Amino acid sequence: LCGTAICSFGIYNVHDQSGITEGGALGLVLLLNHWFDIPSSLATPIIDIVCYVLAFRALGRKFLEVSAISTLSMAMFFRIWEHFPPVLPSLEDKPLLAALLGALFIGVGVGIVVKNGGSCGGDDALALFIHKVSGWRLSRAYLISDLTVLALSLTYIPFKKIFFSLITVTISSYILE
């Protein structure tokens, strides 16, 4: 629960407020929120379920059980944060700081969950699956999904902010490992 609280806090209070996006499933949640006004608390479990179905066979039942708890708690924490205004000042005019702070929250939060045998989002399940079947480093598997979503994010986020998102996803992928 601690990892999902940290991660969701950072996404809501840093990324959602500053326009810095995340890659993978987290970035896809932000895309859906922007494109269709779908709340993060709804989009998160839907995307996660799809990714978990893909990863179930390679990662096993225990991973799925821990991840189910993490996914539900991630949605729960998003729901809690959505009931309050952001507690951090807007970092929209300080994108490098937003990228670094977001990377710290996400990397630490996801790292706690992954080290305890689960994932706090579908991109974790997908990256762990890719890592297991390909032998790639976990950070590389994360970057592949992140870069795909960041490319899609160019539809609503200027390249300058995508640049800062690249900083976030690169740093967070190495922090979690």
Each language-model region and where it sits:
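Core subunits and conserved enzymes of cellular information-processing
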Residues: L1-E177
